[in-house]
Amino acid sequence: MVVLGQGAVPGLDPLARVAGRGTHANLPQDFGFAPVEAAGKALARAVITWADVAAVELNEAFAVQSLACVDAWLKEGLVDPEIVNAKGGAIAIGHPLGASGGRVLGTLAHRLRESGDRWGVAAICIGVGQALAVVLENVSGSAA
């Protein structure tokens, strides 16, 4: 990850730009739903809506946690489950300790580049009711 304001790295072209970010904390007993709120805040900061989003990467600390988030988004009519973890999530491809953020952001940036879609959301549940979310904008030159 490179902060472009600090100068470009010769020979490296950025894949994506962080367009918005959000955090949220629930009571610990409601931990699984925090990514839903964090993602909504990130979208608001990016000044886009779920209708603009083509890809979602959601960490799977536990299967039920991911299902709870997708179910909450479905109940609101916000997200097509087909765009969530389209290449498999942590249960399928691994969940290295301390690497969830890098894994979901990297996977999302590459999904956007491969598809040519412009917007994606990465969200992670980080424990004890907390969550982080980031909106990425594809700037790789293949954005639609």
Residue ranges and their predicted role:
Residues 1-144:
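Claisen-condensing/thiolase-fold acyl-transfer catalytic domains that form or cleave C-C bonds
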